[in-house]
């Protein structure tokens, strides 16, 4: 679906836009409030260790600093581009909600143990606000949320250098979490499939009526 770029005043005049924006913000806040308890349960469950020939051949290194520099620069770029474009922002928020729900489902269905040689990936912000628990969360594996987030932003921004930059960041993050042994190779390779599904579903959630507007130059 091609997204026109309405201004905020034009979008805000549409009751459907206001309703959907309010709904997705409330749902994201509700989900965020439940994630600490859910991830603590995920961490407490026993799981399987998967064979991973690539990780077995790849020495583990702590690249947390570089990983989160790329992630937060990418998020900053994506948010900066999306904030002046309310319809793109709305679809991105619905897709992000869908992505988290899909990830909660896959974590429920596929309990896994961390890859051998895991080097703990430390994110002070998320560890304190989302994954807050007595012990670090290491079993939130299938699929890679870090990789998926940047790829989702790449889909949400307009075509151009910013999309290419976010795609490059996605590849970098997928590589870095493997170097860290924070994810299995399967987690990284599966992320684009779930991003594509969440993005497609977000188009249906927002509805075509919101996009019947003349695109800005």
Language-model-detected regions and their locations in the chain:
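C-terminal membrane module of polytopic membrane proteins
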Residues: 190-217
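N-terminal transmembrane-helix/juxtamembrane module of multi-pass inner/ER membrane proteins
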Residues: 2-75, 112, 123
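Aromatic-anchored segments of alpha-helical transmembrane domains
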Residues: 30-34, 100-106, 170-181
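Interfacial helix-loop-helix junctions of multi-pass membrane proteins
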Residues: 114, 138-142, 172-200
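Hydrophobic alpha-helical transmembrane segments of polytopic
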Residues: 67-71, 93-96, 166-169, 173
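Membrane-interfacial alpha-helical segments at the cytosolic side of multi-pass membrane proteins
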Residues: 76-80, 147-166, 192-202
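Membrane-embedded alpha-helical segments of multi-pass membrane proteins
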Residues: 66-74, 144-148, 189-193
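Membrane-interface loops
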Residues: 42-50, 83-163, 209-215
